[in-house]
Structures are given as structure tokens and as C-alpha cells.
């Protein structure tokens, strides 16, 4: 066993130039782990709370208070504890905070230490993190969901929906899937240039052109896939993060780019029509986080043929996920480590999803860093899918490169599930 002897946190920057927390955990046997916490732009109302300083410094986004919590009372509470006892450490962190949403110490402070502890224990054991968490059994690489057109809160354009994704489920390996995505990404750039559209990128590295409608983004992806020499719906499928809570007001869905306002039933019809016209296989946050009846209608309508992913509605929280399962809401959950704030609670959410035949997708945030922990978590849990942005910006590509190294490390034991990852669809 490896006792914690020192914890050190500092303020660093994320991919949007905003401060975030980095923590290092040191063990008595020389083991050391480091983790940096990401931050979201479109956040669910019930997410664990990241602690910001307020005031003028960094526009109020400084995290000195969170850093002080780590270097002070969190370190004092954890000194001497065994790093291998992850659940015990995470429970101690939650108890020390004393709130339901980690608002006192800050989920950013707590998560940085939780993840750094796992890294330190893995280092002490001489194992990569994915092996330390996942054990010695067979492991599978995730199918990437590549956000190549950014809109909504992730881009300064007039596209309502937040993400339009390539899902190369027809590949034979992760490395082939990545190659397919890269080739379509460059094909998409050429398509945009040929139409006089902007090729600037958004927070997650995808292109962010102004478009006349949300459907126009799907048309661009179809064109790019074909021009790259692949078949939509055979080699590469499409996915969307609608992020509907960002444009849901007064009981209606406001599609500003299309000058339309739809009620819940009409918006379900709208999404169903897109699913009929395009090879969509995944829709995330199709309904507002508080529109539970709308979610039930959407699931009844499309849940047998589309992955319906709950992000803002579930916020990686097992209590809310359990309610969703009981009420027949969605058939998949997005997993964001900083939504819940500890590694143990993250793993519990993935396990609950699996037990109830919900798929789970390990996901980045729009404000990312060079930290690649989520790639290891995706492999360790065998969740089968990962969302970590487009094929540009080092904060996104770092995760893909980590997965390439893991695939190489696993060798012949590496499995890529492909279309089988959508096991709960007809």
C-alpha cells in the first residue's frame, strides 16, 4: 500500500485561456500522479459546482480558493491515507465538503485530487492508468464521436445545435477509425472552402461556419464523407449534440437560425424527420434537461433505433440516472468526470448504465487541457464510446494520441467494437 505524503495544487490554464486546477499527489514509495480539471460551457443545472473566485482577476474566473482548499484542508484530511483505497478517499473528500453538489470546496478542487490519486497509485503499481482501473482482462478501445462542426455555445456562429459528429463505427480498429475521421475532416474543410464558408474552428476544434439551418450542417457532413471515399451509414454514421437546453425557453424550442419556435411534440417530430433523412445513430440532449415528458416522448418515438444520450438531464449522477431509467428516459448517458466530481462516482454511473442496458460515453468538456485521463477511463471501463472533439487543437488531439498509444500497448488484445457498441438498438 502507498500512503499519501503530500498534495500540491496550482492554478493553470485550460484551452479557452481560463484558469483551472492542477493537482499532484505524492506517495511515500515515490509514486506521483498529476491531473488537470476541465470546464464546460453549456452546463447542466444539477452539475457539481466548480469554485471560482469572482472579482476582477481573470474576469472572476480565478481558482485560487479551490487551490487553497487542496493545499490546505484537503491535504490535511488525506495525509497518511492509502492511495489504492480510491473509494475511501473519494468518500472522505465528499464528507469533508459536506454539500450535495461539492459547492463548499469546489468540484474542481475535489476532482483534481481524486484523479491525481488514481494516477499516483497507478504509478506506484507500475501500471498505466487504464490497467490500474480496468484490471488485467481484455479491454476495448472506444468508438470516437468526432465533433467536426461546432455550433451553439461552442462557437460564435448562427448554428443552434452544438455538435455535429462523425462516428466511424464501420472501422476495424481505433487507428483506422481515427484515419477515417481525419480524412473526412480535411475533406470537410475543402467542401467549406469551395462554398466560400469559414474554416475557423470553435472551442472543440470543429469548423464553425454560418449556416442557413441546422440541417445544412448534416448536408455538409454527407458531402464530405462521400468526397473522402466513404459511405454514410456503412462506414461512418452521424451524431448530434442538440444541447436543446441552450435554446429552450418558456416551454418552447427556439431555433433562431431557422426562425422557428416548436413545442415539445413538434420538436420530437423535427428530430425524427432528420433521423429519417440522414444516417443518424446518436442524438444527445434532444430535449431540455427539465422537459421530462418531452424526453419520454422522444424515447418512445426513436429509442429503438437511435442512441438517445442524456447529458444535462443526468449530469453523471446515479440518483438522477436511476430516475431516468425508471421513467423510460433516454437509452444512454454521457459521462463527464467534472459533472459529478470524483472518479468513484464516475465509475458508479458507468456501471449503473451498463447494468440497465444504457450505453455510456466518456466525454471531454469544451474547456479542456493536455490531460488525457478520460482516454484511460474510456478504455478501462470498456464503455465503447468517447467524445473528445474534432481532429484539430492539441487539447483534443492529445486524447486521440493517447488512445493510439494504448491500442499499440494492447497489441492483439485490443478490440474495437464498431457498430456493436450500439448493442441496445434494433
Swiss-Prot record:
It holds the Pfam family Enolase_C. The keyword rRNA-binding does not apply. (2R)-2-phosphoglycerate binds at residues 162, 336, 365-366, 387. Mg(2+) binds at residues 241, 284, 311. It is an enzyme of class 4 (lyase). GO terms for biological process: glycolytic process. Disulfide bonds: none annotated. It catalyses: (2R)-2-phosphoglycerate = phosphoenolpyruvate + H2O. Keywords: Cytoplasm, Glycolysis, Lyase, Magnesium, Metal-binding, Secreted. CDD domains: enolase. The keyword Secreted applies. Gene3D superfamilies: Enolase-like C-terminal domain, Enolase-like, N-terminal domain. Its cofactor is Mg(2+). InterPro entries: Enolase (IPR000941), Enolase-like_C_sf (IPR036849), Enolase-like_N (IPR029017), Enolase_C (IPR020810), Enolase_CS (IPR020809), Enolase_N (IPR020811). The active site is at residues 204, 336. Its EC number is 4.2.1.11. One of its GO terms (molecular function) is phosphopyruvate hydratase activity. It is found in: Cytoplasm; Secreted; Cell surface. Belongs to the enolase family. Catalyzes the reversible conversion of 2-phosphoglycerate (2-PG) into phosphoenolpyruvate (PEP). It is essential for the degradation of carbohydrates via glycolysis. This is Enolase. It comes from Acidithiobacillus ferrooxidans (strain ATCC 23270 / DSM 14882 / CIP 104768 / NCIMB 8455).
